[in-house]
Amino acid sequence: MLGQLFIVFTIGILGIWKSIPVGLVMKMHPLWICIMTIIGAILGILIIMLTGSKIKNFFSKWMKASSIEKKENRLLRLFNKYGVHGLGIFGTLIIGPNMTMALGLTIVYNPKLLFLWTSIGIIIWTTTLTYLGYLGISIF
């Protein structure tokens, strides 16, 4: 059980879209999947926030420039339309919490506010996706 919790936690650092299916495949209880994914994802964005400006340089080296620009444009449209609140909540679902935090640091003036709203987005979407995934498995 501890091994499964650790696996879901560490995968949660990489993003919520990856750890929820892994937890469901390992037949873990949805509450534990949700808790460990939330803790892991929040730790992941905290690390990104603390490393700050070096993140964009890292992404531009290792990812295709067009991929970053496409995600930045999508993120910028989201930010212009909904502000930091919408960016944190909807960006978490659309492009994942790590990319939202990393790219959001380049356009948001207050990283702590972005961290807060991205954390809220992580809690909302992890809970929703875990419940829907569990519900889908229990139907079949």
Language model regions located:
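Short amphipathic alpha-helical segments
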Residues: V84, N98-A102, F115
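Helix-loop junctions at the membrane interface of multi-pass solute transporters
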Residues: V22-M26, L103-V108
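Membrane-interfacial helix-loop-helix
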Residues: M1-F6, M26-T92, Y131-F140
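Transmembrane helix boundary and interhelical junction motifs in multipass membrane proteins
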Residues: Q4, T10-V22, L93-A102
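Membrane-interface alpha-helices at helix entry/exit sites of multi-pass transporters
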Residues: L31-I38, Y109-I120
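Alpha-helical transmembrane segments of multipass membrane proteins
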Residues: G15-K18, L43-I48, M99, G121-L129, ...
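Transmembrane helix-bundle signature of multi-pass membrane transporters/permeases
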Residues: V8-I13, T37-L43, T118-I123
